[in-house]
């Protein structure tokens, strides 16, 4: 018995094939530009209803591209808020490939132009740019430089620095500031300045006698008890001597002198190589007292001092004496320098205690009261 078409043989309606789990549908930019942007694509949508509460990157890029084609601007020039706000409106222009290609060509041309400009700039830097003036011109300009501006002048160029190394530069500087009424030691007088040996050091010392701005610096320096010198740390004691001072007091005072050599800045930075003067001017720049200073402590009576020459100065303290009228100075010397926050024990090293102390003074090598070296 033939059966007619029943409900089991009835044709089924066309079903839509669902994507497999774990795979995403391909995003087409034209879908976003045709008004298919939902509320779920925005950051202020309810995260309980929508899985993601942020704008999809593909949607944002497509909307910005469409706004760019409408406004004739680059995507980087359109704020993201304005681009997304305009995405909700229907797009009248769907095919804007011609305008996009033209804008891409203009962007490409600007990129090539910037690359050419940067290449030319690099060639100018690598090439010999600027003018190189003769040494005589720099020597002439150096005649108008103030003593406190010598460092800035020498940093202009190599020729300017070379001029500051010459004997002519330091001789002219001395003559420019010398006056007949200047009270100078014998080594700093004009007849002794004809020697090239240690000429630079002698001129600098003489400026602290004759040049008013330099002399004012010395008078403005505070007393040692008010500012404990920390620059002497890890300095090496080169020499020590004492002498009796006979003054207005009935009992004489004693002056203890410690000559230190400070740690070189190049050694601190572990950079041994530095800018050295030309060979023909080495005698002019010779200075036996370079980086040296003198610590002078005057006491009311004689105090026995142990041998500390050749040792490293690690600690300097000033406190009130037991009589509450004078100062008490404590010096600590070690066989090796102390680095970082390393702490010393009280029994380590050699301690020198001076009490009672009348005065404490610290002189750099250019100070007028600093004793001259016999080799200068």
UniProtKB/Swiss-Prot annotation:
It comes from the Eukaryota. InterPro entries: F-box-like_dom_sf, TMEM183. Keywords: Membrane, Transmembrane, Transmembrane helix. One of its GO terms (cellular component) is membrane. Coiled coil: none annotated. The chain crosses the membrane at residues 300-320. It is found in: Membrane. This is Transmembrane protein 183. It comes from Bos taurus (Bovine).
């Amino acid at each position: 018995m033939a059966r007619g078409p029943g409900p089991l043989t009835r044709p089924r309606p066309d079903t839509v094939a669902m994507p497999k789990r774990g795979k995403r549908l391909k995003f087409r930019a034209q879908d976003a530009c045709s008004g298919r942007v939902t509320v779920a694509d925005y950051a202020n949508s309810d995260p309980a209803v929508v899985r993601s509460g942020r704008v999809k990157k593909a949607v944002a890029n497509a909307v910005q591209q469409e706004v760019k084609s409408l406004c004739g601007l680059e995507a980087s020039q359109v704020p993201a808020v304005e681009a997304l706000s305009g995405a909700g409106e229907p797009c009248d222009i769907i095919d804007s490939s011609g305008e996009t290609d033209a804008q891409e060509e203009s962007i490409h041309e600007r990129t090539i132009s910037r690359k050419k400009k940067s290449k030319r700039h690099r060639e100018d830097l690598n090439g010999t740019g600027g003018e190189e003036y003769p040494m005589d011109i720099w020597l002439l300009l150096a005649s108008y430089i103030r003593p406190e501006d010598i460092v800035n002048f020498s940093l202009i160029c190599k020729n300017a620095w070379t001029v500051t190394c010459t004997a002519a530069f330091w001789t002219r500087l001395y003559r420019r500031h010398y006056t007949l009424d200047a009270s100078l030691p014998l080594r700093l007088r004009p007849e002794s300045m004809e020697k090239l040996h240690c000429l630079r050091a002698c001129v600098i010392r003489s400026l602290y006698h004759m040049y008013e701005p330099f002399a004012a610096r010395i008078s403005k320096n505070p007393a040692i008890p008010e500012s404990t010198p920390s620059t002497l740390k890890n300095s090496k004691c080169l020499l020590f001597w004492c002498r009796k001072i006979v003054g207005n007091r009935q009992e004489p005072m004693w002056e203890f002198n410690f000559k230190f050599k400070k740690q070189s800045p190049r050694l601190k930075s572990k950079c041994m190589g530095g800018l050295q003067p030309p060979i023909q001017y080495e005698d002019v720049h010779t200075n036996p007292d370079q980086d040296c200073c003198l610590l002078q402590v005057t006491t009311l009576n004689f105090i026995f001092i142990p041998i500390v020459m050749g040792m490293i100065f690690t600690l300097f303290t000033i406190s009130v004496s037991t009589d509450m009228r004078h100062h008490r100075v404590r010096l600590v010397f070690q066989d090796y320098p102390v680095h970082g926050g390393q702490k010393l024990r009280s029994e380590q090293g050699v301690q020198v205690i001076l009490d009672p102390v009348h005065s404490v003074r610290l002189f750099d090598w250019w100070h007028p009261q600093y004793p001259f070296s016999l080799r200068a």
